[in-house]
Amino acid sequence: MMDDSFKNYWMNKLKYFSLFILLFAIYWFPDVILGYPEIYLKSLVGYDRQATATWIFLGNMAISLFLGILICYKLGYYKNTLSIFKIKNILFLLFTTIVLFIIYFFTFTYYNSHFITPGIAKEQAAYSRQIVFPFVQFISFAICAPIFEEAAFRTTIYRFFKNDKIAFIVSSISFAWMHTGANPILIVYLPMSVVLTLIYHRRRVLGESILVHCLMNALLPTIIVFLQTITGLYYL
């Protein structure tokens, strides 16, 4: 009995560790077209090159979303999703979304006032826009990223660690670190990660953190400009 319990324990760990890797492999699948355009699009130039890359990217993205959502659904990741639409939960998510935008605004303003955004990040963004049409990048950023990242960094990590406190810490730090690495911009991503983890931690409903993450990614550029306009705060 002891041997079976020990085996099941480690098999469960292996299952969710492998799932974490699998989710990211599926998530990054569409980016193959961005990484190797000279292989897939070498005979095309200009608009034809960008249009073809866009359709390939959209097709790959559709496959990734289908596989990712199917896997998460089969594993019960979307349990209680419809409960999001209860009034008290909607109000909570609205409040935390507003708080998240405000926190991000102040941390981002502070970061921009004291540090320089790495050139590589700017180059990568510009390069992506040259390969595919901008709306595709928006879909990837506002829809795909939240679905896969929340599934990996929230539910998968919480199932890997049975201790909720450890899961909370690992989820918050690893999500932020994955986006920044050893870079000062961690001061922007870590508070955001903590809030997103708190949203999931509250009821263990993945749909809630996905929804807030989607709103964050979709509206962030507009909200930043709006808050700068009404506060007059550009440096901190």
Swiss-Prot record:
Transmembrane region(s): 16-36, 51-71, 90-110, 131-151, 180-200, 210-230
GO MF terms, alphabetically ordered: endopeptidase activity
Origin superkingdom: Bacteria
Record's keyword terms, sorted: Cell membrane, Membrane, Transmembrane, Transmembrane helix
Membrane topology: Multi-pass membrane protein
Localization in the cell: Cell membrane
Signal peptide residues on this chain, from the entry's feature table: none
BP term (GO), one: CAAX-box protein maturation
CC terms in the record's Gene Ontology section: plasma membrane
Family to which the UniProt record says this protein belongs: Belongs to the UPF0177 family.
Protein name in UniProt: UPF0177 protein YaiH
Organism: Lactococcus lactis subsp. lactis (strain IL1403)
Gene, per the UniProt record: yaiH
